[in-house]
Structures are given as structure tokens and as C-alpha cells.
Amino acid sequence: MADYLTVTHLTKYLKLKFDRDPYLERVYLTGQVSNFRKRPTHQYFSLKDESAVIQATMWAGVYKKLGFDLEEGMKINVIGRVQLYEPSGSYSIVIEKAEPDGIGALALQFEQLKKKLTAEGYFEQKHKQPLPQFVSKIGVITSPSGAVIRDIITTVSRRFPGVEILLFPTKVQGDGAAQEVVANIRRANQREDLDLLIVGRGGGSIEDLWAFNEEIVVQAIFESQLPVISSVGHETDTTLADFVADRRAATPTAAAELATPITKTDLMSWIVERQNRSYQACLRRIKQRQEWVDKLSQSVIFRQPERLYDAYLQKIDRLSMTLMNTMKDRLSSAKENKVQLDHALANSQLQTKIERYQDRVATAKRLLMANMASQYDSQLARFEKAQDALLSLDASRIIARGYAMIEKNQALVASVSQITKGDQLTIKMRDGQLDVEVKDVKNENI
């Protein structure tokens, strides 16, 4: 009679076979991801091809180290071990390592992170800072032993001697490189003497350049208050640091040129040109002023200053005559009124009427005299004010204060440009005049 096995016994036997079979302990498998839904810890999904499906498990630590995200329909190559799950009698593969089929894991991770950061706006042009035209100190984050720092120093020294280079020695590949780049970007931003940053390294494989594709480096460059120039790898290499930086340079030399857009020679030429323009503008202004002074010195006021107050004297004479005539007319009118009043009073029999008329005459006389005195004082004050203003322009009074007046051929001399050697001049002073001959002429500004 045959012995019948229980389901449990059969399952345990099969599990023992699975666990001890060397071919199932390390399986290399390719398949398409199916039924994938990202979980916060371990990942459970299926791998399938055209004819079969196998369940797959990936522990949280393994998934975290992948460097890329699994997606529904993605074809991957995995390494793992096959195990049997006794309660259900089903088998599955526990994945220990995985990479995309046909494309490197880093390349896929690059594209996925680029897509994510683009959607979050990290690479938008509106976040780019303009580079300064003139710098005094440049921070460089790179390896101290590479050709990058040498090329930058050489180019900056050639284009603008005197600009300082501050090197932040940084590990640029391998474990911890991304963290060092981030730390030095933040250190540089704490300084107040830097104008911009150059972040870069020489060429290499995608693995060598990977520190500059890390999200923490992209975040640090994005948050930098200093403008950042990225110069990572060769011209054909592209990193996420290039996308987020304010400017990307294909080579260290190009980065140094971007950092010094205007050379010292260009600046000196511009300064000389501005100086020449300012000098010519000053000469034109001086010439215009000299022409104005020459023209003014030939005007009637300076050649015949007495004509300046002729009109005022005539006006004063007219006002004086008017005042005198007015006073005479009013006195004459007052006398006539007095005669009429005296005649009327002589014919009056009433003493009270005489006294009333006498009071009116006295009042009228007082008002007349007060009015005449007020007008006389007002006209006299205006006359004296005008006379003082005119006398202040009198050349003889200017000479009396200690100045001298120079004449050539009875014409006033206002500038040395009117005099030549050998000219006969007359110098008028307050107590006499001098007749002199010019022996030399010197042009000097006072």
C-alpha cells in the first residue's frame, strides 16, 4: 500500500530542495515589472515575460540603494535567490540587486531625477542670477590637485590681474564627494568677500561625475546666494549641476572667461576714452564761457558805465519836478481857499460861523501839510535808494575801494587775451594813473 504525503510534508520537501539547490541560491533573471505600487518600506511586485510570471520581493534596504525608481512596465535584470513560501505553496524571487535592462542604472537615475527636478522648477530661467561684470574675488570649489584650478588661475590672471582666487579644496568623486561639494558651497555663501562661485572638475565617466548629479548638490546650488558657474567634465558631458547653475561652462578656461567678462585692458581703454571725452567737454565749456566774458566786456555797460544810470537820473529829475509842481499847486489852492474864507468871514456877522470856518481851515492846513510831508518823504526815500544803487556801479567808486582799471587805447581791458607784448596801457587808481608798457604776457587762471 502506497504512503500518502501530507501537503505540509510535500511543501517542506520542496522548500528544502529550493533552499539547497545551488542553481536557485543565485539566480540571474530578466523580466518586466508588473503589478508595481511603490510602498514606504519593502516592495512587492511581479516579474513576467511572454509566457510566465514570478512574484518578486525587494527589501527596503536594497530598494533604497538602487539609485532609481521602479516603474510599471520597466524591463530589469535582477540577481536574487528563489524561495518557497510554505503557507501558500508559492515560490518567489528575493531580489538582491537590480538594474535597468539596456540602460545603465545611473543613466536611468539621471533621467528620473532630471524629470523630477524639472517638474519642481529647479531649472527655470527665472531663478538664474546674472553674473557680475567686475569681480574682485572668485571662489572655486574643486580638487586642489587637478588641472581645473590651474586653468582657472592662469586664465583669470591673464584677463584681469589682481582678481583673487579662493580655493575650497573638495573631493569631487567617490563616497562623500557630494557632501563635501554641498558643505563648501554653504561655506562660501557665509563669506562676504566673494563675488561668485565656480563649481567643477575634469572629465570622466558618469560614475566619476556622479557627485554633481546628486539631488543635494542641485539643492545647494539652487539655494546659493552667490552666482554659480558650473564646469563639470568635458564639453560633451552634462550633469544636473549644469542645469541648475546660473551659467554652464564647457571647460575651466571658459568658466574663468565667464567670471571675468571684461578684461583689465578693456576697462583701462574705457577709462581713457571717458577721460578724453570729459577733457574735451571741459575745454568746450571753458571756451564758451570765455567767449561769453569777452562779449560781455565789450557791451555798453562796461565801456560806458555811466549810461547805466542815466535813465534813473532822468526819472528822478522828473519825479522831483512833479513833486515840486504838486506842492506849488496845492499851496496855491490853499491860499485861494484861505482868501475866499477870509472874504466870507469878513462879511459874516456871526462869531460862531467865523470860528467854525477857522477850525476847518486849520484842519485842512494840517492835513495838507501832513500829506505833503508824507509824499515828500516817500519820494525822497525812493530817490536815495535809486541813487545808492547807481553809485555802487560807478567805476570811480570801485577804484576808490582799492581796485584798478586798465585801459588800452581808452578801451577797458578785461582779459590778458586783449594784450600783447609792447602794448601801451593806462592803469587808473584812486589817487592817479600809471602809463605802462607790457614786457611779457602770461596766461594764468585765478
From Swiss-Prot:
Domain of life from the UniProt record: Bacteria
GO BP term, example: DNA catabolic process
InterPro entries from the UniProt entry: Exonuc_VII_L (IPR003753), Exonuc_VII_lsu_C (IPR020579), OB-fold_nuc-bd_dom (IPR025824)
TM annotation in the entry: none
Catalytic activity: Exonucleolytic cleavage in either 5'- to 3'- or 3'- to 5'-direction to yield nucleoside 5'-phosphates
Keyword Transport among record annotations: no
GO molecular function, one term: exodeoxyribonuclease VII activity
Pfam families noted in UniProt: Exonuc_VII_L (PF02601), tRNA_anti_2 (PF13742)
Compartment(s) of residence: Cytoplasm
Top EC group: hydrolase
EC number(s) on file: 3.1.11.6
One CC-aspect GO term: cytoplasm
Major location (coarse): cytoplasm
UniProtKB keywords: Cytoplasm, Exonuclease, Hydrolase, Nuclease
Subunit field text: Heterooligomer composed of large and small subunits.
UniProt-listed PANTHER family: EXODEOXYRIBONUCLEASE 7 LARGE SUBUNIT
Family the entry assigns: Belongs to the XseA family.
The protein's role, per its UniProt record: Bidirectionally degrades single-stranded DNA into large acid-insoluble oligonucleotides, which are then degraded further into small acid-soluble oligonucleotides.
Designated name of the protein: Exodeoxyribonuclease 7 large subunit
Gene that specifies this protein: xseA
